[in-house]
From Swiss-Prot:
The protein's name: SMC5-SMC6 complex localization factor protein 1
Chain segments carrying region NSE5-like domain: 410-1058
Organism of this sequence: Homo sapiens (Human)
Described function: Plays a role in the DNA damage response (DDR) pathway by regulating postreplication repair of UV-damaged DNA and genomic stability maintenance. The SLF1-SLF2 complex acts to link RAD18 with the SMC5-SMC6 complex at replication-coupled interstrand cross-links (ICL) and DNA double-strand breaks (DSBs) sites on chromatin during DNA repair in response to stalled replication forks. Promotes the recruitment of SLF2 and the SMC5-SMC6 complex to DNA lesions.
Domain notes: BRCT domains are necessary for its targeting to ionizing radiation-induced nuclear foci.
One GO CC annotation: site of double-strand break
Subcellular localization, as worded in the UniProt entry: Nucleus; Cytoplasm; Cytoplasm, Cytoskeleton, Microtubule organizing center, Centrosome
Ubl conjugation as UniProt keyword: yes
Cross-link type Glycyl lysine isopeptide (Lys-Gly) (interchain with G-Cter in SUMO2), residue numbers: 931
First-listed, main subcellular location of the protein, grouped into a coarse class: nucleus
Each ANK repeat, start to end: 806-836, 840-869, 874-903
Length: 1058
């Protein structure tokens, strides 16, 4: 950093934890101060993952700070110094096809430059603001944004004069306006974001002097207008007079008008001070002169006629007249030539105008064709989704969004039901409600009163009938029936006691079922309460699924219309995206739902508990419905959903599923009800597993072309993926550091011992190891024995669920430090989880094997039959850990308990556990423990073959999921090809549209590009299949065979209908 340059003070916003930690790692290489805080501090540079309206983003805008992309840190770290910020600033480049407006994209750059130019301390430096917002985290955040922009925030009670802005919640604005306590305009809370990101910058000094300048400019404009009006009137009169004079010259063949006009024009120069007067005078003079001229013309014509009759008698007169005739002819020819040129020019202009009209009409016609083709393609997608959701019906419903006109619930009946509920006559209350349900919508207060008693376990016997009422309500009066019904369900689906909104109830229900967490308020805690919570989640799933079905049907029914409008906000949109149709996919609720879904499947794979399986199914369904709704809205709005889904969701899910086996991943992917979700998660996993050895993976969104030309050849090479392994020098206690672990290790601090090198295994004294093991075992059985009963004081002091910054529990630390006594005590406690993982994914058994603590390993294996010997991080199992660090005795213990399957496990580099053993003798001893009647070489050869077979099978499954779902979503079926009059005809249409769009617009439509690529790939598919790798054709696996059959069927459709 140059001398005198202030030190960089960095904050970040919008990043996921993994990406943020990786950037922090890079910051350590640079001279800066990093502030890790959710609140805005007085930083110099804000690194933003995307454009947003977060506190830090708005505050940095208001303060005129540098708001930069993450590439600024990445490239600066690579250069070893801070680079110039200009090209990394948000707003440096404006993307035309972005979902953000150009105004919002350029806001950070505009505000920084504006504040620098004017020298103003902040965007709000002349504001005096009163905040009428409830005191909480939200109000504190608003104050920090205002203070960053140098606004003067004033307390409502001490409101002096001169207040410029009153910012309040929408609910309070109307009430406060009626009180009229503040002589200032009111603004909603979202005004701050709109002011900074959406509106043009208006200088406060300019706005103060605006009225003076406006008045002055109006006066000047009026003066100029009067002058211009006089000038235009004079110029028009001149043109008209000249035209009349030229016409008279043509008719009467006069020769003197041109010179008179020139003379007169020279005399009548325009003066700014007396234009009007001179104009009137000149016009009168010009008119009288023209009149005299006409008289003179008539007189001269008579003279000419007389001269021609007397030309034989008067030769001199004849010569004189001939001379005049020659002059007359010259002037006549000049005028005729001028008129001819003018007519030719007018005719040429009319031809150009007609051609321009024809070209415009052709362009409009081509645009219409493009729109028609795009609508046809969208209709195919909508139809495929409608089939998926069983929405195609014979009886269409053309009228939507009609307000529900049900009669008001009878007051007498309402009082009766309320009295029955208060008296705990729940059976009678539910019966009364059921009989009236077909004719009336039950009031929310009644359903809430019943729900409150259901949660308190007061209606145990009749809770089923209550949920039957909710199901009937959803069937008779769905949320999409009208905006009023949507509001009704948003009010209904919340905790009847806390009333914190729908998302709050969803979160509480999931946490109760998934983590056994307490409810948002005190309720009955019995075995059946979790079942009730699961039933409420089922109702929520049915509720949002009905909204997705309705939107799908509506898009299909109205696909021929250009004016499809969706009035009212769906529950899904309000809950997951705060009612914003333009919101990004991964909001906080969606992220939380993703994490819960993945965690629920991890729990499901550990047990056969029906409750856990049903919960995992429900969460996958809710997630799929939410994703589908966001995608359908994006298609309606023309958003490139393929790019957003591939970039955001797929990579996020694949990273979170690192510790899933291939079989678990298959079950996980197939559990999604959403075809889109299946497709993108399968692609993300495929890219990670099958393309990790390839350095260049295309960043283009998923397409048929990408699957056939990139993924299919990559799948054929899975048998040789073991080549080019990275070799890492081994140290005792130092695990091989894989890419996914490096950032965590850097931030958390390396937790392994650093010893010089790995000793040769031949030098190990195995007998000494065995004797020391026996001694330790004897000691652990005698002196170290301890239980919960005889050590109560220790148990009370020990919090075995507590973790340190690395995520290590008491079990991890006992195994790392070889604290056998503490380990035995911990293992005797109820509820202890021996398979618990730290932040990096390591278990206590991993740590004991890694550090060579043999007795700890033995105690775990003896006392915990549920210990997972196959648990892995990037493929590193406990056996990998033990043998890579030379702990052969531990390796023998693990093989005695785990068997030969442990020897078949590979890490991310493709290494087997025995690959770490240098000595053939030790290798044979370890192999003999498994009691396999085979040689180590043959065993490894079979393991290698089995491994590649599994890789090929799993890759085929992933590619099949992508291919089948893609063809289903975009309707690439034989019916589609037939309806398009064959691929050739459709390809010609798409190419024509594409070329037209490229000549008329910088950006082509993503849907046209996608289908054009799909059709081109389908046409070449028969030729491509002939060149498939041989291992794909001969592999006996079910998934590989299914993939080949799918491709062959697509080829038949192409050849048959083209």
């Amino acid at each position: 950093m140059e001398d005198g340059t202030p030190k960089h003070i960095i904050q970040m916003t919008g990043f996921k934890m993994e990406e943020k930690e990786a950037l922090v790692k890079l910051l350590l290489k640079l001279d800066c101060t990093f502030i890790k805080s959710e609140k805005y501090k007085n930083c110099t540079h804000l690194i933003a993952e995307r454009l947003c309206k977060s506190e830090k983003f708005l505050a940095a805008c208001a303060a005129g700070k540098w708001i930069l992309t993450k590439d600024y840190i990445i490239h600066s770290a690579k250069s070893g110094r801070w680079l110039d910020e200009t090209t990394y600033e948000w707003g440096y480049k404006i993307e035309k096809d972005s979902r953000y407006s150009p105004q919002m994209q350029s806001a950070p750059k505009r505000w920084r430059e504006e504040l620098k130019r004017t020298g103003a301390p902040g965007a709000f430096h002349r504001w005096k603001v009163v905040l009428l917002v409830r005191t909480d985290k939200r109000s504190d955040s608003l104050i920090r944004v205002l203070e960053a922009g140098k606004a003067n925030v004033i307390l409502p009670k001490s409101s002096p004069s001169g207040i410029t802005h009153v910012i309040a919640s929408n609910a309070r604005i109307k009430a406060e306006k009626e009180k009229d306590n503040f002589k200032a305009p009111f603004y909603p809370i979202q005004y701050l974001g709109d002011f900074l990101l959406e509106k043009e910058i208006q200088n406060d000094e300019d706005s103060q002097t605006n009225s003076v300048w406006t008045e002055h400019s109006n006066e000047e404009t009026n003066k100029d207008f009067r002058k211009d009006a006089g000038f235009l009137e004079m110029k028009g009169a001149l043109r008209e007079t000249m035209y009349r004079t030229q016409k008279e010259m043509q008719n009467h063949e006069d020769v003197n008008v041109g010179s008179i006009l020139i003379q007169h024009h020279k005399k009548e120069k325009f003066s700014g001070s007396s234009k009007d007067l001179k104009f009137v005078k000149m016009r009168n003079t010009f008119g009288s002169h023209t009149y005299e001229n006409q008289k003179e013309i008539k007189k001269k014509d008579e003279d000419i006629q007389r001269s021609y009759t007397l030309r034989r008698k008067r030769k001199k007169g004849k010569e004189s007249n001939c001379k005049k005739g020659v002059e007359h002819e010259k002037i006549k020819s000049t005028l005729r030539r001028h008129i001819y040129n003018r007519d030719q020019k007018e005719m040429k202009n009319s031809i150009f105008a007609e051609y321009a009209k024809e070209s415009k009409a052709m362009a409009i016609k081509t645009d219409v064709d493009v729109v028609e083709i795009k609508n046809t393609l969208r209709k195919h997608i909508y139809r495929a989704q409608a089939v998926r959701y069983n929405c195609i019906r014979i009886d269409k419903q053309p009228v939507y969004n009609v307000e529900v006109k049900n009669a008001e619930f009878p007051r007498g009946v309402l009082n009766l039901i309320e009295s029955l509920i208060e008296g705990h006559f729940f059976k009678e209350a539910i019966e009364e409600l059921s009989t009236l349900q077909a004719h009336y919508i039950p009031p929310v207060c009644v359903l809430h009163a019943l729900l409150e008693n259901v949660l308190q376990d007061n209606i145990d016997t009749f809770s089923g009938r209550y949920f039957h009422i909710l199901s009937a309500l959803l069937h008779l009066h769905p949320p999409w029936k009208s905006p009023a019904m949507s509001r009704y369900y948003l009010e209904l689906f919340q905790c009847p006691t806390c009333m914190k909104g729908a998302w709050s109830l969803v979160e509480v229900l999931i946490r109760s079922c998934l983590f056994n967490e307490s409810f948002c308020h005190q309720i009955s805690e019995n075995i059946g309460s979790k079942v009730l919570h699961l039933t409420l989640l089922k109702f929520f799933f049915n509720l949002i699924e009905s909204e997705v079905q309705h939107l799908s049907q509506k898009l299909y029914d109205w696909s021929d219309s250009q004016n499809l409008k969706i009035t009212g906000k769906a529950m899904l949109l309000e809950i997951f995206w705060s009612g914003s149709e333009t919101s990004g996919l991964l909001t906080k609720p969606v992220n939380m739902l993703l994490e819960w879904t993945i965690y629920s499947h991890k729990e499901k794979f550990k047990s056969n508990d029906v409750f856990k399986h049903e919960l995992a199914y429900l969460l996958a369904g809710i997630l799929g419905a939410a994703i589908d709704y966001w995608i359908f809205l994006g298609l309606k709005m023309g958003r490139n959903v393929m790019r957003h889904m591939s970039d955001d969701l797929g990579s996020y899910v694949s990273l979170s599923c690192d510790d899933f086996s291939s079989q678990e991943l298959e079950i996980f992917i197939c559990s999604f009800s959403s075809s889109w979700l299946q497709m993108f998660v399968a692609e993300a996993v495929f890219k990670k597993l099958c393309l990790q050895s390839s350095g260049s993976v295309s960043s283009e969104p998923l397409s048929l072309q990408k699957m056939v030309y990139s993924y299919l050849p990559a799948l054929g090479k899975t048998g040789v993926l073991g080549s080019g392994k990275i070799q890492v020098s081994k140290k005792i206690g130092q695990r091989p550091c894989f890419d996914s672990q490096r950032t965590l290790l850097m931030l958390n601090g390396t937790k392994q011992k650093q010893v010089e090198g790995l000793p040769e295994l031949l030098d190990l004294n195995l007998a000494k190891c065995s004797s020391s093991l026996k001694k330790l075992k004897k000691k652990s059985e005698g002196e170290l024995s301890c239980s919960k009963e005889n050590c109560p004081s220790v148990v009370k002091k020990m919090n075995f669920h507590k973790t340190n910054l690395k995520g290590e529990t008491a079990l991890h630390r006992a195994c790392i430090n070889n604290q056998v006594e503490k380990l035995i005590l911990l293992l005797s406690l109820p509820g202890i989880d021996i398979n618990v993982k730290d932040n990096a994914g390591w278990t206590p058994l991993h740590e004991a094997c890694n550090y060579g603590n043999t007795v700890c390993v033995q105690e775990i294996l003896q006392r915990c039959p549920e210990v997972d010997l196959l648990t892995q991080v990037d493929g590193v199992t406990p056996l990998h850990d033990a043998l890579s660090n030379g702990h052969v005795e531990i390796g023998k213990l693990l093989l005695q308990h785990g068997g030969p399957v442990l020897l078949q496990q590979r890490n991310a580099k493709g290494e087997l556990p025995l690959d770490y053993v240098v000595s053939p003798q030790i290798k044979e001893e370890l192999f003999a423990i498994t009691k396999i009647e085979d040689t180590v070489e043959n065993f490894h050869a079979q393991a290698e073959k089995h491994f590649h077979y599994q890789q090929l099978e799993f890759g085929s499954f992933l590619l099949s999921r992508m291919l089948l779902n893609f063809c289903s979503i975009f309707d690439l079926s034989s019916e589609f090809i037939l309806a398009s009059k064959g691929l050739t005809h459709l390809n010609e249409l798409l190419m024509a549209c594409k070329s037209h769009k490229e000549t008329t617009s910088v950006h082509t439509d993503w849907l046209l590009d996608l289908y054009a690529g799909n059709i081109k790939t389908l046409q070449k598919l028969p030729h491509i299949l002939k060149e498939l790798p041989e291992n794909l054709k001969v592999c006996p696996g079910v998934h590989t065979e299914a993939l080949m059959i799918t491709l062959e069927m697509m080829c038949r459709s192409v050849m048959e209908f083209s």
